[in-house]
């Protein structure tokens, strides 16, 4: 009996100690400085942060001074509650709102609220389920000296300022799904004298993007995944970095004379031989504009189009690329394009192949038109069947590396990122043999070769 009471006492003592540790932990959080608590609350939506006010007297007003707000409004329930918000400056404000006849005034009032607190980073996502497309931002939206970052997502309605834009501190601007004509983007750019980064994601009505009067602009990111999205022409003599993603007619590059890094991606699975001809012409013209580009990234669709141009004997421009990234599987239809890029980059120092799932291009006949020249590489249909075979995978990786070393005479370093499908976890010897092969090639060719596993 005494031993039983002793065991029960030890269990109760351990339980009390666990409870005390929990209490001590809670006290530890309660005694944290307000700045740290505000930082913690900045990672959760504001409606959840507001609920912490019931935890204790210490927490009652903590959220009211949190400088980061994240609000999703489908109803007006939060309006009255947030009247108790007391922070003098908002560093980050994110607003997601469904637009209808009752919520239009609320959108305006929330924007005015954020600007009145000298918001620095502002993200606005307005969804229009009425399909009226008539909402316009109030003039005060375009007049802020505190904004440093602005991210606007609309539902394909107009973003046309009726006043002179003044965003004197703005450095990063992102516009998504906006209808913005040339005169409006000119007004906006004129009001952003220190703008450094511009992203245009699926914007309509834009014909000519002229950035010649934006000398501080260094990064330009354009996504044209839908038809009738712009710009049609790009004049950007000051930018250092360009990322261009398109699925229909790409932009015409007029001037990117300062460009040092470019990332080009075509997203399409419905190309025909006829449209491929048009892409081929535009792709080569675009490459010819990259006079000073030192870092270039291209995807598998563009490589297939360049392969088609190579087999047709179309002249390629000579590039000054020093670092080349190719995102593709090692399939037959991209090999001629990769070979020509390597040959026409006489100063290439570093190559970064990165395997990824390949989308079959209907109409380009990728499994037929280069069979005679690249038979050592599998077709886009064959590759996924052969990757389960260790010997075939070794041969494929070796063939690609040999192709690179034969065509890139100045190469110093190659970092090959292979998807997990290339590695057979059931055969440890296979990975050892793969890495041994890479080490031998590296030593024999005086090129540093690294093999890494990606998550693709």
From Swiss-Prot:
UniProt cross-references to CDD domains, sorted A to Z: F-box_AtFBL13-like
Q: Which residues form the F-box domain?
A: 26-72
Keyword Aminoacyl-tRNA synthetase assigned: no
Q: Report each LRR repeat as a residue range.
A: 126-154, 177-202, 206-224, 271-300, 330-355
Stored Pfam families = F-box, LRR_At5g56370
Under InterPro entries, the record lists: F-box-like_dom_sf (IPR036047), F-box_AtFBL13-like (IPR053781), F-box_dom (IPR001810), F-box_plant (IPR044997), LRR_dom_sf (IPR032675), LRR_FXL15/At3g58940/PEG3-like (IPR055411)
Keyword presence, Transcription: no
Q: Which UniProt keywords apply?
A: Leucine-rich repeat, Repeat
Q: PANTHER family under this entry?
A: OJ000223_09.16 PROTEIN
Name of the protein: Putative F-box/LRR-repeat protein At5g02700
């Amino acid at each position: 009996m005494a031993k039983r009471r002793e065991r029960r006492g030890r269990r109760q003592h351990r339980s009390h100690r666990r409870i005390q540790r929990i209490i001590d932990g809670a006290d530890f959080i309660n005694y944290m400085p307000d700045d740290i608590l505000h930082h913690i609350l900045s990672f959760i939506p504001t409606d959840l942060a507001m609920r912490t006010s019931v935890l204790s007297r210490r927490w009652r007003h903590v959220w009211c001074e949190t400088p980061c707000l994240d609000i999703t409004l489908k109803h007006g329930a939060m309006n009255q509650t947030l009247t108790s918000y007391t922070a003098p400056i908002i560093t980050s404000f994110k607003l997601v709102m469904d637009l209808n006849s009752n919520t239009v005034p609320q959108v305006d009032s929330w924007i005015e609220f954020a600007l009145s607190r000298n918001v620095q980073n502002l993200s606005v996502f307005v969804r229009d389920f009425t399909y009226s497309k008539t909402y316009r931002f109030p003039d005060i939206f375009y007049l802020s000296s505190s904004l440093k970052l602005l991210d606007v997502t609309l539902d394909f309605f107009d973003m046309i300022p009726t006043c002179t834009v003044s965003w004197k501190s703005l450095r990063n601007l992102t516009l998504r799904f906006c209808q913005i004509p040339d005169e409006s983007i000119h007004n906006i750019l004129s009001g952003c004298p220190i703008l450094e980064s511009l992203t245009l994601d699926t914007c309509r009505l834009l014909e000519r993007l002229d950035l010649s009067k934006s000398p501080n602009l260094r990064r330009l990111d354009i996504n044209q995944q839908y038809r009738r999205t712009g710009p049609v022409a790009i004049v950007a003599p000051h930018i250092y970095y360009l990322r261009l993603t398109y699925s229909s007619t790409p932009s015409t590059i007029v001037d990117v004379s300062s460009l040092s890094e470019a990332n080009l991606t075509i997203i399409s699975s419905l190309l025909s031989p006829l449209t491929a001809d048009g892409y081929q012409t535009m792709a080569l013209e675009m490459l010819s504009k990259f006079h000073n580009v030192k870092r270039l990234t291209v995807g598998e669709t563009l490589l297939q189009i360049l392969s088609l141009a190579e087999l047709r004997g179309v002249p390629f421009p000579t590039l000054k690329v020093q670092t080349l990234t190719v995102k593709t599987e090692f399939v037959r239809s991209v090999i001629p394009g990769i070979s020509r890029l390597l040959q026409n980059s006489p100063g290439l120092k570093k190559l970064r192949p990165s395997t990824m799932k390949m989308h079959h291009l209907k109409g380009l006949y990728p499994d037929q038109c280069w069979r005679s020249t690249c038979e050592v590489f599998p077709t886009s249909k064959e590759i996924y069947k052969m990757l389960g075979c260790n010997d075939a995978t070794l041969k494929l990786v070796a063939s690609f590396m040999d192709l690179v070393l034969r065509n890139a005479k100045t190469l110093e370093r190659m970092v090959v990122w292979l998807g997990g499908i290339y590695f057979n976890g059931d055969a440890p010897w296979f990975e050892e043999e793969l890495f041994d092969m890479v080490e031998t090639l590296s030593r024999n060719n005086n090129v540093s070769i690294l093999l890494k596993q990606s998550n693709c």
